[in-house]
C-alpha cells in the first residue's frame, strides 16, 4: 500500500477540552481527504500527578466555559479530584504499539468517558474505554506496564516538549511552558522562558510524505500549534499537496453518521457538513437517536 501524500503528526491528550472541542476540525479533514492523509498520534501528557494549584472547582469552571463556547458534550459537574492524564496516555501508547488499528477508537472512548464525568486515572475508566474500543482489557493492562511502552510514552513527551522552530515563531497561542499541570490544558497559553516550551493540544505538524508532482513545487512541512480553525489546516494541506481531491459535502446527516461509525456531537456533524449547529439539529432529531451529555450529547443511527 502506497503512502499518503500528507502525514499529520497530531499532538494531543485525552484530558484536554480544547483538543476535544477541536475534533470537529479533524473530522472535517477526514471527510474531505480520507486516505490521502496519514495520521500519527503523539501523547503530550498534560499531567503526571494531581495538581495542587488546580482544584476541581477551577476545572469545572473551565469545562463550563468551553462547553458553552463550542457546544461540545462536556459535563461540567465538579469532579472529586482533578485526574492526571498519564495513565490514559500510557494506555493509548500501549494500544498503538500492539493494536494500532484500535488507537483512534481508544482515544475517542477515553475522551467521551472523561468529559461525561469519569476520571482518567481510574482503572474502571480505562477498562471501560478498552472494552468499548474492542481491546482485550486484561492484556492491555498488563502490556501498559511494559518497559517498551514507557519508553515510547517518554519519547512522545519529549517530542511534545521540543516544538519546531516554525512553531516557536508562532508562539502566541500554541505553546506553553512544559510543567505538566492540568491548568495548562484548559487556559490559553502564557509566556515563559524561551527554552521551556511544549505544544498545547491539539497541535499539528503537517508533512509532505511523497514526492510532489514534477511541475508543482510544494512546501515540505507546515506546523500549526494550538487550536486552529479548519481553514488553516485546509490552507496548509493545499500548500503541501495541491493535487489532493476534496470529497463533496455530505448530502445528509445520516450520511455523516453512517460514515463515522461512532456517535457524534451536534458540533461535529455540523462541521463535517460545513453547516452551523442549528442547521443540522432538526435533521438529526428526525433521523437519529440522542444521548445527552452536558449542553449537547451524541447522535447515532438507530
Model-assigned labels for residue ranges:
Residues 1, 9, 32, 194-197:
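Generic structural signal for beta-strand residues in well-ordered domains
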Residues 2-28, 42:
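Local sequence-structure signature of Cys/Sec-based thiol-disulfide redox active-site neighborhoods
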Residues 21-128, 266-269:
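Structural alpha/beta surface segment adjacent to cysteine/selenocysteine redox centers
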Residues 23-30, 112-301:
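C-terminal cap of thioredoxin/glutaredoxin-like
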Residues 3, 34-36, 287:
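Short, well-ordered coil/turn elements that cap or connect secondary structure elements
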Residues 17, 48, 213:
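Flexible, glycine-rich phosphate/dinucleotide-binding loops
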Residues 5, 88, 198-201:
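A structure-centric signal for secondary-structure junctions around beta-strands
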